[in-house]
Regions:
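Conserved nucleotide-binding/hydrolysis micro-motifs of P-loop NTPases
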Residues: 7-9, 46, 89-90, 116-118
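Short aromatic-enriched loop/helix-cap "lid" or pocket-rim segments at secondary-structure transitions
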Residues: 13-17, 95-97, 121-124
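Acidic/histidine-rich, metal-coordinating catalytic segments
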Residues: 78-91, 120
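C-terminal anion-handling pockets and recognition modules
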Residues: 122-177
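Extended, low-complexity cationic-aromatic segments
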Residues: 1-68, 169, 176-177
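Mobile genetic element proteins and their domesticated derivatives, centered on retroelements
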Residues: 3-5, 42, 48, 67, ...
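RNase H-like polynucleotidyl transferase catalytic core
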Residues: 26-32, 101-121, 137-139
């Protein structure tokens, strides 16, 4: 079971950071946005891994491209993929439904109730990513954002993948002794 969601747009802008001033002084700093990026992601709770891909837009065509990537990623090793997602219009469009039924018949959508993001396990990971990779960071352009998110995803998977491996090794060792 995979938990899917989109994050964004994430803006490439300069964060001024903290500054000191008297209480009544107002600091105005114009921030120029140098680009926007939308991130599509899935969280696989069976192995505690994330997969993300960035796009300039957040529309049905990008969602379908992301679904194709997920389908290829899991290959023939998985017979059925259950994708838990929210009720965004890009998930429910007629075009998306037709293409999924025609070309990706092993992918099944499981829609969450309206206004219930807490049921989507990827939401917590988005919060972690926002805090660790995006907040208080300076990005020159979209590729900087994409690299920061890609690096965060890689580091998340390395850290959590190792943890799962360690748990499995401990389980095997305890069974043999």
């Amino acid at each position: 079971m995979l938990y899917q969601d989109e994050k964004g747009p994430v803006a490439a802008k300069t964060h001024g950071g903290p500054s000191w001033c008297s209480v009544q002084t107002k600091i105005e700093k114009a921030q120029k946005i140098k680009g926007l990026l939308n991130v599509f992601g899935v969280y696989d709770h069976t192995n505690d891994q994330m997969y993300t891909h960035s796009y300039k837009n957040k529309k049905g065509d990008q969602f379908l491209d992301f679904i194709k990537r997920i389908d290829r990623k899991y290959g023939s090793s998985v017979k059925q993929i259950f994708l838990v997602l929210d009720n965004a219009s890009i998930h429910r469009s007629k075009k998306v439904r037709e293409i999924i039924q025609k070309h990706h018949h092993r992918i099944n959508f499981v829609f969450l109730p309206t206004r219930s993001p807490e049921l989507n396990l990827i939401e917590v990971r988005w919060l972690w990513m926002q805090r660790q990779a995006v907040n208080n960071s300076t990005f020159r352009n979209e590729s900087d954002i994409g690299k920061a998110i890609s690096d965060w995803t890689y580091n998340y998977n390395e850290k959590h993948g190792r943890r799962i491996t360690d748990i499995l090794q401990i389980g095997v060792m305890s069974m043999t002794t």
